[in-house]
Amino acid sequence: MTPIVFIDRDGTLIEEPPDFQIDAYEKLRLVNGVIPALLKLRDAGYHFVIVTNQDGLGSPAYPQASFDGPNALMLQIFSSQGIVFRDVLIDRSWPTDNAPTRKPGIGLMVAYLQDRDIDWARSAMVGDRPTDLQFAENLNIRGFQLRTPQFGGDWDWDGIAHTLADAPRRAVVQRHTKETTIRVEIDLDGAPQARITTGLPFFDHMLEQIAKHAGISLQISAVGDLHIDEHHTIEDTGLALGQAVRQALGDKRGIGRYGFDPPQLPWQVSGAAAHGGFTLPMDETQASAVLDFSGRPYCVFEGTFVRERVGDMPTELVPHFFRSLCDASGMNLHLSVHGDNDHHKVEACFKALARALRQALQRHGHVLPSTKGAL
């Protein structure tokens, strides 16, 4: 789905003159900061639509020809810098006409309101007047009023671009079944912290490792049918956590996508490290994790356990948790472990996964890390 920034023209893209009509070339001046802001938003995946009231356009008071020249030059300037507008919607009525197509009315938006490919949750309206904020409210999207001497406002273009393009990646997932009730709250850019309660203290401890070593904020509350078995609680927690990660990532623009170790020198390669994954030692144990947020879930787990359980967590559910996590997050994970102590082996698996996650989740600009155009 595509987010759209709906943008007023006069006073927002171009400076508004005292007579409120840009009907001559010498009146055309861009608003400060608009081009770098739109480039940042473009790279973050936004499309742009101009929505403007042009009082009496086409009448003797405002001839069409007087409008067309400066408007065409404005569009050409933006296009020359890589900024293309998906549409230009113009209302030509007078304020006294009370036309439904005139902002803050949304009569011009009928086709967009019927478009199911628009990401309305991320879309926004930018303008210089209170009526632009009312227009945003009527569309149920976020509104930004640019700061101007004529109408006030609190925002500049740099702040708007930062707020929309660098928005925190957060998600809240609530999963209810006859067997479990689980709530996961995640902030991929928050300070590393964890509040975990699943009724299984050792499992809680392992989930805390993910938050700590992935560098994320994570809250999980799980109530399951532990009087029957641990299976449902551990499996459904993996599914809910994976769903939360997937939602928080959004369209995945700018992420590292892959989690792996830097290249190793030949004499540093041994054992599980030869797989090229994020390799982590824990005393006699070594675990390796490589992952890809490809959108194609696949989990390969290599390792065995001697004990039936570590603490209150059955060891047979360790690989099952990771498979559930992959299924719900759309992640491809290869995880291997070898060692002698089963406690060390389980903990090393969770830590290796977390460190690979840290690398894959990091943002590097706003480019989508795929030649397909979608992940």
Curated annotation (Swiss-Prot):
Enzyme Commission (EC) number: 3.1.3.15, 4.2.1.19
Binding site for Mg(2+): D8, D10, D128
Reaction(s) this enzyme catalyzes, per UniProt: D-erythro-1-(imidazol-4-yl)glycerol 3-phosphate = 3-(imidazol-4-yl)-2-oxopropyl phosphate + H2O; L-histidinol phosphate + H2O = L-histidinol + phosphate
Domain of life the protein comes from: Bacteria
Cofactor requirements of the protein: Mg(2+)
Keywords, ordered alphabetically: Amino-acid biosynthesis, Cytoplasm, Histidine biosynthesis, Hydrolase, Lyase, Magnesium, Metal-binding, Multifunctional enzyme
Residues of the active site: D8, D10
Pathway: Amino-acid biosynthesis; L-histidine biosynthesis; L-histidine from 5-phospho-alpha-D-ribose 1-diphosphate: step 6/9; Amino-acid biosynthesis; L-histidine biosynthesis; L-histidine from 5-phospho-alpha-D-ribose 1-diphosphate: step 8/9
One annotated GO molecular function: metal ion binding
Stretches assigned to coiled coil: none
Presence of keyword Hydrolase: yes
Main location class: cytoplasm
One Pfam family this sequence matches: Hydrolase_like
Segments for region (Histidinol-phosphatase): 1-168
PROSITE patterns the record matches: IGP_DEHYDRATASE_1, IGP_DEHYDRATASE_2
Protein name per Swiss-Prot or TrEMBL: Histidine biosynthesis bifunctional protein HisB
Species: Xylella fastidiosa (strain 9a5c)
